[in-house]
Amino acid sequence: MIKNGKPFSNENGWEDKKLLDQLDPEEQKIVLEWVRANFIPIKRANYKHSSYYLKHVMQYENGIYLTNNQFKDAMLICGFNPVDPNELNWRYRISEKSPAIQKMNRGECCA
């Protein structure tokens, strides 16, 4: 769900209210640059990839651990709104041509 413009998760009975600003500024910068460089926005929903899986792709590439909620916060900051904010693992309107997804499809990450 979104509260006050920020993601908040308690759908599985465990609260995840950590946000991106709880990382040090350099890590925040790396994460936001990675999101902007690795996802191409589209108009239709892409249900193939969840926030939970995508955060692991990012972690594999840059070594920065994020909670699911922190990753969702980064996506919101970069303008990627969830298809359904009431789901635990958000889906986005991102293209299969996005660099992160192309790397996944080629087996270049998350081995």
Over which residues does each language-model region extend?
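Short, flexible active-site loop motifs that bind/organize anionic cofactors or intermediates
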Residues: 18, 44, 61
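Positively charged, polyanion-binding regions of nucleic-acid-associated proteins
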Residues: 23-49, 55-57, 74-76
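Charge-enriched amphipathic alpha-helical scaffolds
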Residues: 61-85
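Structural motif detector for alpha-helix initiation sites
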Residues: 50-51, 68
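Residues in intrinsically disordered, low-complexity segments of regulatory proteins
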Residues: 13, 33, 51-52, 89
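Charged low-complexity interaction tracts in eukaryotic proteins
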Residues: 3-20, 77-111
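Short strand-loop junctions, especially beta-strand C-caps/beta-turns
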Residues: 57-60, 95
